[in-house]
Amino acid sequence: MSHLSQQRICSGENPFACKVCGKIFSHKSTLTEHEHFHNREKPFECNECGKAFSQKQYVIKHQNTHTGEKLLECNECGKSFSQKENLLTHQKIHTGEKPFECKDCGKAFIQKSNLIRHQRTHTGEKPFICKECGKTFSGKSNLTEHEKIHIGEKPFKCNECGTAFGQKKYLIKHQNIHTGEKPYECNECGKAFSQRTSLIVHVRIHSGDKPYECNVCGKAFSQSSSLTVHVRSHTGEKPYGCNECGKAFSQFSTLALHLRIHTGKKPYQCSECGKAFSQKSHHIRHQKIHTH
């Protein structure tokens, strides 16, 4: 440490102040690094992929992802990491430590980023917007997966029948058709599900739990997707547009029903007289003619 730096520590002198937040620093170089966070300047670019960073130390860490260099090893399982913070996060899996707790429901997480993503289930916030159709998402990874719909990319293929999907989760759902496996069973009624998330949603029927609340009117829902659709009744958002006539809808299912007007598809047929209908509700209403 230089004599000048020691003098500043002793005297309490910190002459370099951030004009944005007022935070003070003893060195101009430290202030300059701090200011990058405000103006989002990212002068340090990765030569491999072009990704930019605000500080040199971050680009050096990032470059390890390209070289495959993994110097830090977990003592429990032997898994290795190129960055210390990734190792520390990983080790919490073994210790069971979950320091980041949601103030709304008490659910705890290993990483702060996971807590932030979870909190959006309570607020309904979806900051990631698709440039093609305007649909919004709570996580960037969800947006990335959704965008494959527009470019027609379907990298996930079923080994059984060859059907391809744009998102891995849809492939996993589809594969249960072939296996018929339903490992997740409800303790209340015995109903079984192929996915854990489906069981969690189902259990709320018994518990009456509705964790997703509308910030506008206070109405609560058991599923985040139901809240998303409901919020559109306040905002007027209609992200699903018909390519034939331009009419827009707040729900994809409503668009699917509407498209049958153009295609003439009528999948619901009366077993009594053979008359066909485009909507299930119309089919049910018609059947009452035969029962009376």
From Swiss-Prot:
Domain of life: Eukaryota
Cross-linked residues, Glycyl lysine isopeptide (Lys-Gly) (interchain with G-Cter in SUMO): K157, K169
Subcellular localization, as worded in the UniProt entry: Nucleus
One GO cellular component, as annotated: nucleus
Residues joined by cross-link Glycyl lysine isopeptide (Lys-Gly) (interchain with G-Cter in SUMO2): K28, K51, K56, K173
Region (Interaction with TERF2IP): 212-292
Pfam families for the chain: zf-C2H2 (PF00096)
Zinc finger map (C2H2-type): 16-38, 44-66, 72-94, 100-122, 128-150, 156-178, 184-206, 212-234, 240-262, 268-290
Subunit-level organization: Binds DNA. Interacts with SUMO conjugating enzyme UBC9/UBE2I. Interacts with the telomeric protein TERF2IP.
Family: Belongs to the krueppel C2H2-type zinc-finger protein family.
Protein name listed in UniProt: Zinc finger protein OZF
